Swiss-Prot record:
Chief subcellular location: membrane
Protein name as annotated: Killer cell lectin-like receptor subfamily E member 1
Keywords: Cell membrane, Disulfide bond, Glycoprotein, Lectin, Membrane, Receptor, Signal-anchor, Transmembrane, Transmembrane helix
PROSITE patterns: C_TYPE_LECTIN_2 (PS50041)
Ranges of residues in domain C-type lectin: 120-225
Annotated S-S bridges: C113-C124, C141-C224, C202-C216
Domain of life of the source: Eukaryota
Function: Lectin-like receptor for natural killer (NK) cells. Can either inhibit or activate NK cell cytotoxic activity, depending on its binding partner. Heterodimer formation with KLRI1 mediates NK cell inhibition whereas heterodimer formation with KLRI2 mediates NK cell activation. Plays a role in allogeneic recognition by the immune system.
Keyword Cell membrane: yes
GO-annotated biological processes: natural killer cell activation; natural killer cell mediated cytotoxicity; negative regulation of natural killer cell chemotaxis; negative regulation of natural killer cell mediated cytotoxicity directed against tumor cell target; positive regulation of natural killer cell mediated cytotoxicity; positive regulation of type II interferon production; stimulatory C-type lectin receptor signaling pathway
Membrane topology (Cytoplasmic): 1-72
Source species of the chain: Rattus norvegicus (Rat)
UniProt tissue specificity: Expressed in natural killer (NK) cells.
Protein encoded by which gene: Klre1
């Protein structure tokens, strides 16, 4: 009888253990299944979130058509090109001006004029410090391989002097007119303020507004040109 009870007890225990094991397996399987479902739900939520983000980005892009971006880029490029063109123009102008100034400076430094002569417009000029009568002034210029200046309008505009100088103009009593010292007629309008004068009168020059008819025996400084 006791053995029968022991066997029954053992069977009951085994049965309970098996039942617990089954329940444990069921719970574990159920737990795993729930965990798998939760992971799927999280993954689906993540996909939906990514999809929504992508849609948002696409939506923003749709609000700004590609041609607007292209036009903005082209506008910036045009501004840059204009700036570069302006800089190049300024640089070229400045370089040209510097070269021109350099050429003028070099031309002044390397002019072919003798010492104490002035270079202007491809000619050399000598302004004397000594005073001579008109005929002696003429001979002095000839000794320098030059002549008393026969002025043109450009020289009259350029030379504005502090004193009166002899120039190559004299009054010819025979023809009753003022002539260059080579006996040629003055151009129209040159020294037009000089009036008819008696014999032995020559022209002295200070500026285009100041020139005189003076006795050729007067001693003045003189201007030579070659």
């Amino acid at each position: 009888m006791n053995q029968t009870l022991i066997i029954c007890s053992t069977l009951n225990v085994n049965s309970q253990q098996k039942s617990k094991a089954k329940n444990s397996m069921k719970n574990t399987f159920h737990s795993n299944e729930l965990s798998s479902i939760e992971q799927r739900q999280k993954y689906q939520k993540h996909l939906k979130k990514d999809k929504k983000t992508a849609e948002d980005i696409t939506g923003v892009g749709n609000c700004s058509p590609p041609w607007r971006l292209i036009s903005s880029v082209l506008f910036v490029v045009c501004l840059l090109l204009m700036a570069v063109a302006m800089v190049m123009t300024i640089f070229t102008t400045r370089l040209s001006s510097e070269r021109s100034s350099s050429n003028i400076h070099q031309e002044g430094l390397h002019h072919p004029c003798p010492e104490n002569w002035v270079w202007f417009r491809c000619s050399c000029y000598y302004f004397s410090k000594e005073k001579l009568v008109w005929r002696e002034s003429q001979r002095a210029c000839l000794s320098f391989n030059s002549s008393l200046i026969r002025m043109n309008k450009e020289e009259m505009d350029f030379f504005s002097l502090k004193s009166f100088f002899w120039v190559g103009v004299y009054y010819d009593e025979t023809s009753k007119q003022w002539l260059w010292d080579d006996h040629s007629v003055l151009p129209s309008g040159m020294f037009s303020g000089l009036e008819s004068s008696p014999k032995n009168f020559c022209a002295s020059y200070k500026s285009k507004e100041a020139y005189l008819a003076e006795n050729c025996s007067t001693k003045l400084m003189y201007i030579c040109k070659k």
